[in-house]
A protein has these predicted regions:
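Sequence signature of WD/YWTD-type beta-propeller architectures
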Residues: 1-157
């Protein structure tokens, strides 16, 4: 992008919301959330930086998935997700991971694993630049306010 805001291009063009993009460690893919399948029920997608190849990674229309983030190794995605099948008041955001494999030729997601199981919100996960720490925001503190939490990441080194 130029300093004046020119020289930009759109890479998605579908009905609904597309947002929350993050680059892969090799800068060739972007992960993002979208409600194009069902309004407000965010699913995760990957698209190459040219906008030519797109892959849907989650497909549960009762689940809200947001804040996807790459592990620096490029082997995992992490995100916040909540089951909305019984309505928003009973939905609890927890953290989920997916092993991934990608190259210039394509992007493939694997099995989804839930890694936190709290009745309060675990959201906005990020990895340290060396991939050894996981940090997120949670309301699991005694006073239920949003606070920062950290843990060693023991997979995907």
């Amino acid at each position: 992008m130029n300093a004046d805001g020119s020289n930009v291009r759109q890479i998605t063009n579908v009905d609904g919301y597309d947002g929350g993009p993050f680059f892969s460690p090799d800068n060739k893919w972007i992960i993002f959330r979208s409600d194009r399948k069902k309004e407000h029920m965010l699913q995760l997608f990957a698209i190459d930086v040219n906008g030519k190849h797109e892959v849907q990674l989650t497909d549960n229309l009762n689940q809200v998935n947001w804040c996807p983030y790459f592990h620096p190794s490029g082997k995992y995605l992490i995100w916040s997700g909540a089951d909305y099948s019984r309505g928003p008041s009973s939905a609890h955001f927890n953290l989920f991971t997916m092993e991934i494999n990608y190259s210039d030729a394509g992007f493939k997601g694997g099995d989804i694993t839930q890694i936190t199981f709290d009745s309060r919100a675990d959201v906005l996960p990020v990895f340290s630049p060396d991939g050894k720490k996981l940090m997120w925001t949670s309301t699991r503190s005694e006073d239920k306010t949003s606070q920062l939490w950290i843990a060693d990441w023991l997979r995907g080194k």
